């Protein structure tokens, strides 16, 4: 019997998609109803608490400078924050890597990040739940409950539509 050394890309894609959906089923069930109230330093070393934003929707986005998908997502988060910060929602970007403070400041200026950027060390989970990959975004309701988690990129439109749907239910 001879095994082919050629990779069938269609089968690999099907396997990847199957594993992706399976991981979403496993990880998706770990959303907590009431999050722990985290407190993380921002780029000015001021502690930011999640509970300080009660009364607004909070988009908590875990990201890193080395993550290409995170970088393409940043303009979407900038747009969403700009459109909603004075109304009903804010974005908190949580940098999830070991990076110097000055490097992080330069990076956030270069990408015009208009929302608070908080700092934490990489770990398998956070106060909000598991971080299976980057970017990971949690959506916290005005009451402080985690209502959604997205592993992978989000768009301004997707976030706004989800909030509108939740607000009308």
Cite the ranges covered by each PLM segment.
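Hydrophobic beta-strand anchors of alpha/beta hydrolase catalytic cores
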Residues: 59-60, 91, 137
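Thiol/disulfide oxidoreductase modules built on the thioredoxin-like
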Residues: 106-113, 119-164
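Short loop/turn microsegments at loop-to-beta-strand junctions
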Residues: 35-36, 58, 134-135
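N-terminal secretory signal peptides that target proteins for export/translocation
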Residues: 1-11
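N-terminal "domain-start" segment that seeds a small globular fold
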Residues: 26-50
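Structural microenvironment flanking redox-active thiols in thiol-disulfide oxidoreductases
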Residues: 71-111, 121-125
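Short active-site neighborhood of thiol/selenol oxidoreductases, capturing the structured segment around
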Residues: 50-68
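Bacterial N-terminal signal peptides
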Residues: 16-26
């Amino acid at each position: 019997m001879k095994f082919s050394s050629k990779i069938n890309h269609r089968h690999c894609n099907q396997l990847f998609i199957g594993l992706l959906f399976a991981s979403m089923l496993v990880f998706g069930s770990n959303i907590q109803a009431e999050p722990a109230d985290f407190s993380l330093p921002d780029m000015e070393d001021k502690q930011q608490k999640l509970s300080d934003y009660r009364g607004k929707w909070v988009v908590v986005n875990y990201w890193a400078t080395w993550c290409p998908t995170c970088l393409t997502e940043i303009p979407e988060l900038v747009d969403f924050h700009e459109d909603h910060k004075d109304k009903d929602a804010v974005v908190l970007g949580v940098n999830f890597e070991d990076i110097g403070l000055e490097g992080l400041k330069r990076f956030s200026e270069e990408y015009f990040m208009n929302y608070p950027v908080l700092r934490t060390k990489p770990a398998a989970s956070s106060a909000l739940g598991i971080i299976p990959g980057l970017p990971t975004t949690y959506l916290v309701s005005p009451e402080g409950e985690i209502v959604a988690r997205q592993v992978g990129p989000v768009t301004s439109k997707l976030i706004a539509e989800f909030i509108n749907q939740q607000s009308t239910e």
